[in-house]
Design a protein with these regions (language model features):
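Membrane-embedded catalytic scaffold of the fatty acid hydroxylase/desaturase
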Residues: 18-101, 105-179
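A membrane-cytosol interface segment of integral membrane proteins
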Residues: 182-190
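Hydrophobic alpha-helical transmembrane segments
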Residues: 1-12, 92-102
C-alpha cells in the first residue's frame, strides 16, 4: 500500500458518504418508533424540547445534554464503519484508512458542534457566517417538518432524496441574538 492521492480522495468520498449516512440514520432510526431508543431520545425528547421559533433555543439548562448524542455514539459509529473501511482498503489495495477515519470523525464532530450552536446560540463568530445561518435555517425547518431537511452538516442527501425544502423564513438576527441572551442568562443562573 502506498500513500498518495488515495487518502485525500478517501476523505472526500467518506465526507460525502457522511451526508447519506446521517440522512439514513436520522430518517430510519431517529424518526421511526420501531427503534425505541433513538426514536425516544430524538423524535420525542429532542423535538419535544426544541421546537420552532423561540422554542428552537435552549430554554432550560437542565436539558442541555439533550442537544448532543450520548458519549458512546461516536466510537460506535466509527467501529461500525471499520469492517467496510478495511474491506475497501484491501479490495482497492490503497491506503484509505486515514482519509476515511478523518472524514467520519470530522463529520461527526461538525454534526455535534453545529447542532449544539444551532440550539444554544452564544453569538459565536461561526453563528454569524452565511454558511452557518443557511444550515441553521435548514435545520430550523426540520424542526417544523420532521421528515424534511434531515441533514445538519451537508445536505447533499436531502437534495438527492428530495427531502430538502428551502427555509421560507430565516431565523432573523434578532431571534438568534435574543436566543443567545436567553441562553446566557439561563446558563449563568444555573
Amino acid at each position: 500500500m502506498i500513500f498518495g492521492i488515495s487518502e485525500p480522495v478517501a476523505f472526500v468520498c467518506f465526507f460525502v458518504y457522511g451526508s447519506f449516512f446521517e440522512w439514513t440514520l436520522h430518517k430510519y432510526l431517529m424518526h421511526q418508533p420501531r427503534w425505541l431508543y433513538p426514536f425516544r431520545a430524538h423524535a420525542l425528547v429532542h423535538h419535544g424540547l426544541f421546537r420552532t421559533g423561540e422554542q428552537y433555543f435552549l430554554s432550560d439548562p437542565k436539558v442541555i445534554r439533550k442537544v448532543r448524542f450520548a458519549w458512546w455514539h461516536a466510537p460506535f459509529i466509527i467501529l461500525l464503519h471499520m469492517p467496510v473501511i478495511f474491506w475497501l482498503q484491501d479490495m482497492l489495495a490503497l491506503n484509505i484508512l486515514g482519509g476515511a477515519l478523518s472524514a467520519l470523525i470530522l463529520y461527526y464532530f461538525l454534526y455535534e458542534y453545529l447542532h449544539y450552536c444551532m440550539h444554544i446560540p452564544k453569538g459565536r463568530w461561526l453563528e454569524k457566517t452565511f454558511w452557518f445561518r443557511w444550515l441553521d435555517s435548514h435545520h430550523h425547518m426540520h424542526h417544523k417538518r420532521h421528515f424534511n431537511n434531515l441533514n445538519v452538516v451537508l445536505p447533499i442527501a436531502d437534495i438527492f432524496f428530495g427531502t430538502l425544502i428551502p427555509a421560507k423564513e430565516h431565523l432573523a438576527t434578532p431571534n438568534r441574538e435574543a436566543g443567545a441572551q436567553q441562553v446566557s442568562l439561563l446558563l449563568s443562573a444555573s
